[in-house]
From Swiss-Prot:
The gene is SCML2. MBT repeats lie at residues 33-131, 139-240. This is Sex comb on midleg-like protein 2. Keywords: Isopeptide bond, Nucleus, Phosphoprotein, Repeat, Repressor, Transcription, Transcription regulation, Ubl conjugation. Its main location: nucleus. Residues 476-495, 535-545 have a biased composition (Basic and acidic residues).
Length: 700
């Protein structure tokens, strides 16, 4: 339990509430604090480490300033929010909830259950909430969250440590010594004593301070530590106050008779050595804690000479250390670009680590010879949106878990020891693990999945665009249309022609660095980055006509940066809704194309992307029954497909599962959709908007 240089050098003391002017002129300042000496001088014993809910070996703190994580709002424990690491000291993190100000910063241990990696909330089916006191309109929260996470550095799951187990019994005894967090100044850890024990609670009293700072807590509280904890973790332990008489073993200066039996552990006029790592903050315990001040770093060894103490010197603010925090200039950089980029003082400009991505699963596609179709059906419809490393790991792990022969699929993964996500598999009686390459962009993750799917011979299994819930099969769409009417099935087979009024959703390029190139291609015909696709005529089977235009944006490795056009608007709706208009990506397909030979015309463009036309509600109803409240479940689903193809895929199954017909559609509210249907806030708000628009155009 050796003393660290940083801790010894930081002579940061608390102001003595009972200090008199006479004692301040001759008391001795102590530059360090040793538990062994203190226990011997006071005749006390320290509480055994088994009494605490703390790790026997303190956890390693490898977090960096600026990292993002999920944390529970300390003022609303039911909400999980996005937080940023603002400061680091010992095994603790100073956190700030994104969307709040610096008045509500809080501290957590690296093994606290209140913090978790970004993506955990989504994985468990929960929603990230705005913090209490969110400074903007709550309707802006989804967009704020997206901007905050995009390009930010996410704390790796390996940085989070498991919470230690709870001691079975309360074995604390009155008089035992320990280290405890001052709850009125939570950045301080001070020597304390067990003042009382009642059931599973203990009374914490701070040595040398009045009872104003004492508090009761559970015996398994994470705010109390065994003696010596700060030295082991590199945190700063504040020395006791002045009420405890201590026999000094160091040279004493002359003292007045009034203080012969009492020695102050702090005196501002004594010589103090401040090493280069010292940082300055407030530490008066007389005043209530205010906002955390910005720490300042000293660049040279300073020698503070004795000086006469004035009448108001008792109110002088003392320095308070915060290890591994940031300078004022760095803190300013933490908040630029709406908090999207951060700098670490130790490592310089931070690297943009990752963005977000969402990948959809085609459960009616070709699974190849290596994946079990039954297990594929049990997968979620999509992975994400979330950090690219998390989404990539979950998808690859799902493919390994769905393998007919785990060893074969696992063998397609090439080991990479650069610190990426870990994939595990069990075969040959052993558990094997392999690291994926580290990812820092959505395009890299999508290209990796393209190659992986190509190796598994299931090129159309994954897509960056949603699939149709019942018409994504590349071989026979009729097999998955048992719940559709015969008329709809026949109409779908005639949809190889696209009318000028047919809506084509905007397809996001696989790589965000690609030029804005809009091109048409068939499902099996990739478009290369150079723009040189091979125009050709394809003979499509009768069963594959509908699937060719309803396929998703497959992740095909045949090209470097492939793009595919995904459509989900049927020909019958285009004819029945004359008021529906859209702006196509480029050009139009030749009207002379036969149903069996479709020539795809391509043209490079750099103008603004196209938009999805949202039909007027009054026009939409003409394609169905007169009154939307009489719509069937299938008509509601068809309405959503035409209104917003981007969210219609996941909604189709939900609407069928919950039997959402026209009447139920009008009764849907955002909170109901989020709570009972599991929708995220963004899709729920979109759906509410469409419902309101539909109500406005409702027939009287």
């Amino acid at each position: 339990m050796g003393q660290t240089v940083n801790e010894d050098s930081m002579d940061v003391k608390k102001e003595n509430q009972e200090k008199t002017p006479q004692s301040s002129t001759s008391s001795v300042q102590r530059d360090d604090f040793h538990w062994e000496e203190y226990l011997k001088e006071t005749g006390s014993i320290s509480a055994p480490s088994e009494c605490f809910r703390q790790s026997q070996i303190p956890p390693v703190n490898d977090f960096k300033v600026g990292m993002k994580l999920e944390a529970r709002d300390p003022r609303n424990a039911t909400s999980v929010c996005i937080a940023t690491v603002i400061g680091i000291t010992g095994a603790r993190l100073r956190l700030r909830l994104d969307g709040s100000d610096n008045r509500n910063d809080f501290w957590r241990l690296v093994d606290s259950p209140d913090i978790q990696p970004v993506g955990t909330c989504e994985k468990e089916g929960d929603l990230l909430q705005p913090p209490l006191g969110y400074q903007m309109n709550t309707s802006s929260w989804p967009m704020f969250l997206l901007k905050t996470l995009n390009g930010s550095e996410m704390a790796s799951a390996t940085l989070f440590k498991k919470e230690p187990p709870k001691p079975p019994l309360n074995n604390f005894k009155v008089g035992m010594k320990l280290e405890a967090i001052d709850k009125k100044n939570p950045y301080l850890i001070c020597p304390a004593t067990i003042g009382d024990v009642k059931g599973d609670e203990v009374h914490i009293t701070f040595d040398g301070w009045s009872g104003a700072f004492d508090y009761w807590c559970k015996y398994d509280s994470r705010d109390i530590f065994p003696a010596g904890w700060c030295r082991l973790t590199g945190d700063v332990l504040q020395p006791p106050g002045t009420s405890v008489p201590i026999v000094k073993n160091i040279a004493k200066t002359e003292s007045s008779p009034s203080e012969a039996s009492q020695h102050s552990m702090q005196s501002p006029q004594k010589t103090t050595l401040i090493l280069p790592t010292q940082q300055v903050r407030r530490s008066s315990r007389i005043k209530p804690p205010g906002p955390t001040a910005v720490p300042k770093r000293s660049s040279s060894v300073k020698n503070i000479t004795p000086r006469k103490k004035g009448p108001n010197s008792g109110k002088k603010e003392k320095p308070l250390p915060v290890i591994c925090s940031t300078s004022a200039a760095s803190l300013k950089s933490l908040t630029r670009d709406r908090g999207m980029l951060y700098k670490d003082v130790a490592s310089g400009p931070c690297k943009i680590v990752m963005s977000t991505v969402c990948v959809y699963v085609n459960k009616h596609g070709n699974f190849g010879p290596h994946l079990d179709p039954k297990r594929i059906q049990q997968l979620p419809d999509h992975f994400g949106p979330g950090p690219v490393n998390v989404v990539l790991r979950r998808i690859v792990q799902a493919c390994v878990d769905c393998a007919l022969e785990t060893k074969t699929v696992f063998g397609y993964l090439k080991p990479d020891n650069r610190g990426g996500e870990v994939i595990t598999a069990s075969f040959d009686g052993e558990t094997h693990s392999i690291q994926l390459p580290p990812v820092n962009s959505a395009s890299f993750a999508l290209r990796f999945l393209e190659n992986f799917c190509h190796s598994l011979q299931c090129d159309n299994l994954l897509s960056s665009q949603p699939f149709s819930s019942s018409r994504g099969h590349t071989h026979s769409s009729a097999e998955h249309d048992k719940n559709q009417s015969a008329k709809e099935d026949v109409t779908e087979r005639q949809s190889t022609k696209r009318s000028p009024q047919q809506t084509v959703p905007y397809v996001v390029p696989l790589s965000p660095k690609l030029p804005k190139t809009k091109e048409y291609a068939s499902e099996g015909e990739p478009l290369f980055a150079g723009g040189s696709a091979i125009p050709k005529e394809e003979n499509l089977s009768e069963d594959s006509k509908s699937s060719s235009l309803n396929s998703g944006n497959y992740l095909n490795p045949a090209c470097r940066n492939p793009m595919y056009i995904h459509t989900s608007v049927s020909q019958d709706f285009s004819r029945s809704v004359p008021g529906t208009t859209s702006s196509p990506l480029v050009g139009d397909i030749s009207p002379k194309s036969s149903p069996h030979e479709v020539k795809f015309q391509m043209q490079r463009k750099s103008e603004a992307p196209s938009y999805i036309a949202v039909p007027d509600p009054s026009v939409l109803k003409q394609g169905f029954s007169k009154d939307p409240s009489t719509w069937s479940v299938d008509e509601v689903i068809q309405f959503m497909k035409h209104t917003d193809p981007q969210i219609s895929g996941p909604l189709a199954d939900l609407f069928r599962q919950h039997e959402i017909d026209g009447k139920a559609l009008f009764l849907l509210k955002s909170d109901v959709m989020m709570k009972y249907m599991g929708l995220k806030l963004g899709p729920a708000l979109k759906l509410c908007y469409y419902i309101e628009k539909l109500k406005e155009g409702k027939y009287s």
